[in-house]
């Protein structure tokens, strides 16, 4: 299974806010054997969001964060309404915020849109993943190896068997 993450927010692109959602989603999805192919950062503008959604090919899951709130620059739900035209989303409960998440399905692709507030996105995605992926969860073993002065090419040869 594979995924794409779309981070929406002018505040991130202009450097005022640090994105905390992409890394969390990537680490969490790995536990469910979902490989993230790319992460894209785009502006809070309907044409940019729709254009990015049109580029989706050969992806199982698309995760969007940001732009679901009540302010005038929160346009993600409007863009999704246009992109999915007559399809109504399933609403995802937001236990600690005001904006619900959205779940669409088009063909074989599941689209999940979460608020950009990290605490809200984390709780909502954990709840969703435990429902959606729980039976598929795998436990990975990770090793951290710290080295000094060893070229990457030599390390690659030494660690080749660990990658399997």
Question: What do the predicted segments below correspond to?
Answer:
Residues 1-164:
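Non-catalytic beta/alpha edge segments that cap or flank active sites
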């Amino acid at each position: 299974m594979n995924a794409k993450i779309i981070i929406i927010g002018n505040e991130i692109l202009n450097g005022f806010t640090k994105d905390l959602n992409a890394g969390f989603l990537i680490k969490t999805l790995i536990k469910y054997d979902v490989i993230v192919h790319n992460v894209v950062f785009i502006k809070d503008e309907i044409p940019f969001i729709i254009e990015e959604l049109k580029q989706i090919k050969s992806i199982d899951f698309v995760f969007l964060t940001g732009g679901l709130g009540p302010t005038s620059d929160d346009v993600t739900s409007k863009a999704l309404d246009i992109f999915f035209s007559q399809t109504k989303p399933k609403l995802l409960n937001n236990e600690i915020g005001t904006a619900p998440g959205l779940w669409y399905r088009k063909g074989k692709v599941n689209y999940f849109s979460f608020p950009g507030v990290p605490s809200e996105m984390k709780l909502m995605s954990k709840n969703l993943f435990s429902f959606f992926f729980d039976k598929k969860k795998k436990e990975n073993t990770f090793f951290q190896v710290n080295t000094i002065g060893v070229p990457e090419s030599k390390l690659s040869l030494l660690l080749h068997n660990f990658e399997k």
